[in-house]
Structure formats: structure tokens, C-alpha cells
Regions:
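Substrate-binding/catalytic cleft of secreted carbohydrate-active enzymes
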Residues: 200-205, 264-292
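Non-catalytic accessory regions flanking glycosidase/transglycosidase catalytic cores in CAZymes
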Residues: 2-260, 290-312, 316-541
Length: 541
């Protein structure tokens, strides 16, 4: 590597050596109305089917993280899930359309996946034994997981070139779902197929055929769950957005079939790309995916307003993620920006690839210790409520901002992301409510003292003005030692580390005077909670 390239990489990874500048910015939060609402369990993580033989770019990062062999007894795993109270877990992935279920009249032996040169994705069919399914459900019940299970949508079809034709054979899925119901296992949602829409990835199915088989699956679920409440949701197609395919699918399946359209996001490209970090820190690059969100929203509004949008799988970089990138602090800039952007575009659920496995796991594949993105996800889950508010900024594109109603209490939570490696931003925060309140107060109380007028000016952070100082809560995420590729994150300067028994550390905020500007350092992330922010749009969320 030439010296200039080495220097640029060094400066990107260790930004503290640069001379910092301070830039002022103003944010206006629209608090009178919400622009969208997420599901109460917006944060979701996936468990995949890949065996340890899954390799990319001369590395094999999956270990024993599969649905079939993950160590469910590991205390770190249980505590990581329980910290979310009810973490949504999506079981699926590339190999799900090769999974058979060892129940009923299955006529083939129940063998695990094995390498097969002419197999889909280089693997043979695999099988889920019911004793493993029993153990998984015991684990989900113990940890409070909300389960989305991806069904095999290729069973019974025939491959003709890349496209798969013929009707879906539903008998194995029928027996599996029936077994699941008989055991009292609660499934939040069933998903049909993985990355079979449009041109597909390893395989594809025509939209009309797919929709007709979805109608059959819906009928099957209605029949099997006729005496069970609540009835699980039905999701599809679990693939990359294709306008024509999605429109046809919605038109043929009709308004009573699918509850949510699931789509996948891997907008950073292959995990082998040496430019992953520069993509993550480039606001123009991050903005590109907004067109997909916008177009899907329009497709649903025009063709299937009964359905909601879910991101069923998103890992940033595909093919197992980027080594020493996807599992480090720098990836959190991409991840939290995705969470904010997706919510703005009416996404109800966001499933991160993966909870564990590959380079992009929220947990380390071998040690089960949380990577930085885990803590970003948990902070989001605990602070950002369902209601999404619009934010207008006059600042640099390197300052990203998102606002939600604060979770389970009054107020508003603001997320700031500083992508600049040199600029500290000093941010003034106002709201549409504060402006109207101030104007009204000025008109009605012209003769009041300056001090009382000042209290009225800042009354947007509380329902009543008082002599007591008003504070906001700040949760500031930075990388350990200023190294963007650190596997450790700091919260307000303190390392986020598990206890010896795997307990998740507490999140203690720094309290700041609410009337002072919000400061955010270069290459850092900050959640700011305004506890008593007057936000009419947050009522009844």
C-alpha cells in the first residue's frame, strides 16, 4: 500500500489527530403530528441456517450459529435477548427454501445441510428435527422472543433454468404448522420464501404463481388456526424490492392475504469491498437507499394499502458482511441511520442480519459478547418510541438527525449522527410547538418580567415553567480509543462491557441544561431525551 493511502486510512480510523472545528446547526422538530408509526417491537434480529462450512472470501465466519446448532444454553445469549424484553427474531435466510421439517409423512431421511456442488447456494437440502424445534421454542418462551419463521416456498417446484415452476407442495408445511400448534408454540408470523422475488438471488418464482400459493398458505393457516388466538401474521416475499413483481404480487394475492411485505437491504455491496468504511461515512451514499424506501411506500399505497412494510433482513454488506467492519463501531453509523431512515418511510419492523453469525452479528459468533451495534440497537429500543417525527435541519449533510416520541414516557428523543471526522456540531433544537407557544406567550404577557418571559421561551420542554432547572438526558456513543474499527463502544466515556455472568451494563445518561446547545463530537452518535417535550403528535401512540 502506498504512503498516501496509508495516511488517509490512518486519518479515517484515528480522527482525533485532526484539528477539529465547531459548526453551528439548527434543528426544527415537527411535534404537532407524527409522520409514521413503527411496530412496538421495531428492532428485530435474524437467526440463519448457514452451517459452519459457509465461507466467503477465504473466511468461514459462521461457526455454530445456525438455527440447527446454536448453543441455546449459553447464558450470554439468553441475557442478550432478554434485555429487549420481547426481541423479534426472524428465522430464515438463503437456505430456508431447502429446509424440510421432520414431521408427518416426510418420505426422506432428516439429514443436516452438506456441501453439494450442484445444490442451491452450494448446499444440499437440510432438515429441521422436531426435537430441535422443541428446544428452540422452549428457548424463545424463556427469553421472550417473538418469532417469525420463514417457510420453504420451493418445495415441490421444478427448476427450469433459474426460475422455479410448478405449484408449491404444502403438505410438509401443513404438518409442521399443525405440530407447532399442537405443542402450544406461539409464532408471531409466518413468512413465505426467501429472495425468490424479481430476478431472485439463487432462484426465482413468477409473481402470479407466488401470489396464488400465498393464497393457499393463507387458507391453510386460517384452517389450522381457526380455534387459536391470536392468529399469526403472514409475510412475504422476503426479497429485494422489484416494482413490477411487487405490484403483480399484490394485485393477484388481494387484500385478505398478506399482512406485511418484507424486503431486504444490502446497500453497502459485497463484504469484500475495501471501500466499506468510506461508503458508511458518506452521506450521499447513505441517502441512495431512500429511493427504495420511498418507492416501496408508494407501491403499497397504490396497490396494497392493507399491507405494511417490513425489512425482513438487512446486513449492510452481503456475503456474511465485511470482516473488521460489520462487527466494529463504524458499522453503527450505517445501522442507526438505517433504523432512522426506514422508520421515516413507514417501515414497521427492521430485522438485522444477524443476531449471531457471519461478520455482521450483533453478538460475536464465538464468544457471544455484544458487538457495538448490539448496544446501538438496545439504546434505540429503550429510548425511541413508535411515533416518528419529522426533523428539518439547516446543517451539514454530515449531521444526520431523526426524532421519535420517547418510549413509554412523555417527551421526544432525538438521534444525532456525526459522520464528519473533523467537525464538532453545536446544535440548537427547537420545535413547532415551542415556536407557537413562545409567540402566544409573547402576545399575552408583554408586561411580564424578562425572567418569566425566558421561562415561557423554554416551556416547550415541560408542561409548566418553574424555577427548577430543566435537564435533558444524553447518551453519547464513541469508539474505544477513537478507533472506528474497535469492537468496543463507550457510552458517555465509559466502556460498555458485560459482567462476568453476562449481564448487560446499565445505560446511565449525562444530564445537561435543556436550554444549552447540543454538542456532538466528530464521528460519534448521540441519543438525546427531552423528558417533558410538549409534543401533541405523540399523544395516543
Amino acid at each position: 500500500m502506498h504512503f498516501p493511502a496509508v495516511l488517509l486510512l490512518f486519518l479515517a480510523l484515528f480522527p482525533t489527530v485532526l484539528t477539529q472545528t465547531v459548526e453551528h446547526a439548527e434543528l426544527l422538530i415537527e411535534t404537532t403530528a407524527r409522520i409514521s408509526d413503527t411496530d412496538a417491537n421495531y428492532i428485530c434480529a435474524t437467526l440463519d441456517w448457514w452451517p459452519h462450512e459457509k465461507c466467503n472470501y477465504n473466511q468461514c465466519p459462521w461457526g455454530s450459529s445456525s438455527v440447527l446448532n446454536l448453543d441455546l444454553s449459553h447464558p450470554f445469549l439468553a441475557k442478550a435477548i432478554q434485555a429487549f424484553e420481547h426481541l423479534r427474531l426472524r428465522l430464515g435466510g438463503s437456505l430456508q427454501d431447502q429446509v424440510l421439517y421432520d414431521v408427518g409423512n416426510l418420505k426422506t431421511p432428516c439429514h443436516p445441510f452438506r456441501k453439494q456442488k450442484d445444490g442451491l447456494f452450494g448446499f444440499s437440502n437440510g432438515c429441521l428435527p422436531m426435537d430441535r424445534w422443541d428446544k428452540l421454542n422452549s428457548f424463545f418462551k424463556r427469553t421472550g422472543g417473538l418469532v417469525t419463521f420463514g417457510l420453504n416456498a420451493l418445495h415441490g417446484r421444478q427448476k427450469i433454468k433459474k426460475q422455479w415452476r410448478g405449484n408449491w407442495q404444502s403438505s410438509n408445511a401443513h404438518d409442521f404448522i399443525n405440530y407447532t400448534i399442537s405443542k402450544g408454540y406461539e409464532i408471531d408470523s409466518w413468512e413465505f420464501g426467501n429472495e425468490l422475488c424479481g430476478t431472485g438471488v439463487g432462484a426465482s418464482v413468477d409473481a402470479e404463481l407466488y401470489a396464488k400459493d400465498m393464497i393457499r398458505l393463507k387458507s391453510l393457516i386460517d384452517q389450522l388456526y381457526k380455534d387459536v388466538h391470536p392468529k399469526p401474521l403472514l409475510l412475504a416475499p422476503g426479497g429485494f424490492y422489484d416494482k413490477v413483481w411487487f405490484e403483480k404480487f399484490l394485485d393477484v394475492s388481494g387484500p385478505t392475504t398478506v399482512n406485511a411485505l418484507t424486503h431486504h437491504i444490502y446497500n453497502l455491496g459485497p463484504g469484500s469491498d475495501h471501500n466499506l468504511i468510506s461508503k458508511i461515512l458518506n452521506p450521499k451514499y447513505l441517502d441512495k437507499i431512500s429511493y427504495t424506501f420511498r418507492n416501496l411506500t408508494q407501491t403499497i399505497q397504490a396497490n396494497g394499502p392493507w399491507a405494511s412494510a417490513w425489512i425482513g433482513e438487512s446486513g449492510g454488506a452481503y456475503n456474511s458482511g465485511g470482516r473488521n467492519v460489520s462487527n466494529t463501531f463504524v458499522n453503527s453509523f450505517w445501522y442507526v441511520d438505517q433504523l432512522g431512515m426506514a422508520a421515516k418511510y413507514k417501515t414497521k419492523v427492521y430485522c438485522r442480519q444477524t443476531l449471531i453469525g457471519g461478520n455482521y452479528g450483533l453478538l460475536d459468533t464465538n464468544t457471544f459478547i455484544p458487538n457495538p451495534d448490539y448496544y446501538s440497537a438496545l439504546l434505540w429500543h429503550r429510548l425511541m418510541g413508535r411515533g416518528v417525527l419529522d426533523v428539518n435541519s439547516n446543517g451539514s449533510p454530515y449531521l444526520r438527525s431523526y426524532a421519535h416520541c420517547t418510549k413509554e414516557r412523555a417527551g421526544v428523543t432525538l438521534l444525532l449522527i456525526n459522520l464528519s471526522n473533523q467537525t464538532e456540531f453545536s446544535v440548537g433544537v427547537k420545535s413547532t410547538t415551542s415556536i407557537s407557544l413562545h409567540a402566544s406567550a409573547k402576545a399575552q404577557h408583554k408586561k411580564r418580567s424578562f425572567l418569566h418571559g425566558l421561562k415561557q421561551t423554554v416551556s416547550w420542554v415541560g408542561s409548566k415553567a418553574s424555577d427548577a432547572p430543566l435537564s435533558r438526558e444524553e447518551y453519547h456513543l464513541t469508539p474505544e480509543d477513537g478507533n472506528l474499527q474497535s469492537r468496543s463502544a463507550l457510552l458517555n466515556g465509559r466502556p460498555l462491557q458485560l459482567s462476568k455472568t453476562g449481564d448487560i451494563p446499565s445505560f446511565s445518561p449525562v444530564l445537561e441544561d435543556v436550554s444549552s446547545p447540543v454538542s456532538i463530537a466528530p464521528l460519534s452518535i448521540k441519543f438525546i431525551v427531552f423528558p417533558n417535550f410538549i409534543a401533541p403528535g405523540c399523544r395516543e401512540v
